[in-house]
Each structure stands twice: as structure tokens, then as C-alpha cells.
């Protein structure tokens, strides 16, 4: 599937992943020829599902047993892999396959579902839920957040109650809106791609198919739709 050339690439949205020293632990490899959200395609040969399945299979066992910290796990569909330095709080629940990186935090009542890739120093906080998503190093979903079928760049912070909507009400293909035009993503479930250091205020919502460039800000109680460049302001 072809997408407009004007869509921001992974190198534009996540420059530290390409130019800085590699972070501790494991991070996914992003497409450079396809649209950045192609990694969310369920059957993509190098998509999130394929890469995470390969990653968790490379471990003989999880470096940390999260149940010793009071968490519960479900490995009926795949392993739950947690690095030894990660902080896992009581009452959290993790479903495999999933990966939690070095010094990441999974706080009380967090719900980490299948194909969640939580990179080093990322946070899934109290009453927050992730599913088929990537939180790059230092990304935070700390309080009452939902992150589904999405990518949060390094340094992204979601304010309390922020929700990333990933499914249209009619269940149809998610479309992206950019420069007054609308085009299909090829995905039925697609939340948002948030470039590095984006800040979303409390109780904000991103509609399905949002892409925000680096350092964008969303004010509290604001709903965002579309594709926007770096440093955009909403609300």
C-alpha cells in the first residue's frame, strides 16, 4: 500500500532511535521505506507482532519473575519477559507475549496486554492499559490512560485520563487526515503515533489515526484528529 510522501517518517518522529547511542535493553526496528505505522500491521513480516514474538523467544526465561512483586501474569499465549531492573508493583497484570525493559515501571493496577513493548525507563501507571503498542524509552502513560495500537516516542507524556482511541465507531478502516485530504491506513485498529517529547494534557483524546510531530502539545480536554508537524499546538 502506498501512502503520501509528506507523511513524517520514523527518522523524523523518533530521531534519537537513529542518531543517539542505543538505549539499554531492546527496542523495535522501525520501517524506513514504508509509513511508520506499517509496523502496526498485524501480518507485516517485520511488524510489531513479528519482532516481539522473536524477541521474547530469544529469552530462556524472564530475568525477573513479576509475580514475586505481587503482579499476576498470563502466559497462555506467549511469554511475559521483564528485565531484572524493571519495577513491577503489586496488583498489576501482564499478558504475554510482552516485554518490559530496563528500569521501566509497571505500577499498581496497570494492565499490560499482548504485544506491548515497554522500553527502558518507560512507565505504565495506575489504571493505565496498553495493547499492541510500543512505548519507546522514557515514554509515560502514568495515570488512567489507554494506549492501543500506538507508538509513543521517547519522552512522550500522557496527562491523567488521556485516551488514545484506536477503533472507529463503525469498525471500519482508520483513515488519516492531512492537508485537507483523507486516505486509508490499511488498518482497522490504529491509535496514534506520537513523536518524541509530545505532551498531552489531562483528559485529552486522540481520535484513531493521529500522528503528531516531535514536541507537539495538546491542551487538557482537547480532542485531536489528523496528521500534524513538529511543534504543533492543539486546544
Predicted region positions:
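Glycine-rich hexapeptide-repeat left-handed beta-helix
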Residues: 27-29, 39, 126-127, 132-235
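Glycine-rich active-site/cofactor-binding loop and its immediate structural neighborhood
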Residues: 76-115
Amino acid at each position: 500500500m502506498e501512502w503520501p510522501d509528506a507523511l513524517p517518517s520514523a527518522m523524523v518522529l523518533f530521531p534519537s532511535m537513529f542518531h543517539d547511542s542505543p538505549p539499554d535493553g531492546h527496542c523495535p526496528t522501525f520501517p524506513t521505506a514504508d509509513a511508520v505505522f506499517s509496523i502496526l500491521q498485524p501480518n507485516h513480516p517485520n511488524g510489531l507482532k513479528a519482532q516481539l514474538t522473536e524477541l521474547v523467544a530469544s529469552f530462556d526465561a524472564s530475568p525477573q519473575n513479576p509475580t514475586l512483586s505481587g503482579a499476576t501474569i498470563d502466559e497462555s499465549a506467549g511469554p511475559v519477559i521483564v528485565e531484572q531492573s524493571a519495577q513491577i508493583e503489586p496488583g498489576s497484570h501482564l499478558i504475554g507475549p510482552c516485554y518490559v525493559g530496563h528500569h521501566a515501571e509497571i505500577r499498581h493496577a496497570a494492565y499490560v496486554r499482548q504485544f506491548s513493548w515497554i522500553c527502558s525507563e518507560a512507565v505504565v501507571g495506575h489504571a493505565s492499559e496498553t495493547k499492541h503498542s510500543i512505548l519507546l524509552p522514557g515514554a509515560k502513560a502514568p495515570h488512567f490512560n489507554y494506549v492501543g495500537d500506538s507508538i509513543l516516542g521517547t519522552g512522550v507524556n500522557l496527562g491523567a485520563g488521556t485516551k488514545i482511541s484506536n477503533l472507529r465507531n463503525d469498525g471500519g478502516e482508520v483513515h488519516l487526515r492531512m492537508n485537507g485530504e483523507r486516505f486509508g491506513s490499511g488498518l482497522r485498529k490504529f491509535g496514534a503515533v506520537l513523536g518524541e517529547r509530545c505532551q498531552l494534557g489531562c483528559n485529552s483524546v486522540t481520535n484513531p489515526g493521529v500522528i503528531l510531530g516531535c514536541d507537539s502539545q495538546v491542551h487538557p480536554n482537547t480532542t485531536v484528529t489528523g496528521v500534524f508537524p513538529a511543534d504543533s499546538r492543539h486546544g
